[in-house]
Design a protein with these regions (language model features):
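Gly/Pro-rich hinge or "lid" segments in bacterial periplasmic/extracellular proteins
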Residues: 23, 27, 115-168, 172, ...
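A structural "hinge/loop" feature
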Residues: 1-9, 32, 58, 80, ...
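Short, hydrophobic alpha-helical packing/hinge segments within bilobed ligand-binding/sensory domains
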Residues: 68, 184-185
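A local structural motif
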Residues: 44, 99-101, 165-176
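N-terminal lobe/hinge region of extracytoplasmic solute-binding protein
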Residues: 1-40, 70, 139-140
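Surface-exposed binding/hinge segments that line
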Residues: 37, 82-125, 148-150
């Protein structure tokens, strides 16, 4: 899966983390980013949360964030999220735990745009496996770990006990596809 639809995005939010995510009132809340600072009208600086690890034990750093944005901004990727981040011109690494996002012009809605679930992938693992193999057995830093996928039947996730925001109360989640729109809930 490339996470190019809303149902896939819901699965993605469980397995991966984002810089910001909307709360129940649709207000962007920091996740992997701790905060932001406007350097100038087109440059936003984000310190990243330290101590976050991917499910394979690899620490999450600015390199992973930049890789994930660069991938999503590449027109060849054809990601579902591109329209939300198309105002981004460049992502720069300042240090291991700080990035800058440079936009094409002033973008007062950038935090809202970042809250539409641009997932952060482990750069080295993604490059090593390639997109197709990575998405068959995804590794994220989110509250749930990928366990298995049976095509047209189910995706199984288990709680990430080492999640930076506390282990989920639910220990196992099963996503089942419902092909008929009329029967979806």
């Amino acid at each position: 899966a490339k996470y190019n639809s809303i149902p896939e995005s819901n699965f993605g939010v469980a397995v991966f983390d984002t810089l910001y995510l909307n709360d129940e009132k649709a207000i962007p809340q920091p996740r992997l980013a701790l905060s932001y600072k406007l350097v100038n009208e087109t440059t936003w600086e984000f310190p990243l949360r330290k101590g976050v690890v991917f499910h394979n034990g690899t620490p999450l750093t600015a390199k992973d964030v930049k890789f994930s944005f660069d991938r999503a901004l590449d027109p060849q990727t054809k990601t579902f999220f591109f329209p939300f981040i198309s105002t981004i011109k460049e992502v720069k690494i300042i240090d291991d735990f700080t990035i800058q996002i440079i936009t094409n012009g002033p973008d007062p809605l950038l935090l809202k745009r970042l809250s539409f679930s641009l997932f952060v992938f482990p750069a080295d693992l993604f490059k090593e496996k390639g997109a197709e193999a990575f998405f068959r057995n995804p590794v994220g830093s989110g509250p749930f770990k990928f366990v298995s996928w049976t095509r047209n039947d189910r995706m199984v996730l288990e709680a990430n006990e080492a999640y930076w925001d506390g282990a989920p109360k639910v220990k196992r989640v099963i996503f089942r596809p419902v092909p008929e729109v009329a029967t979806k809930i």
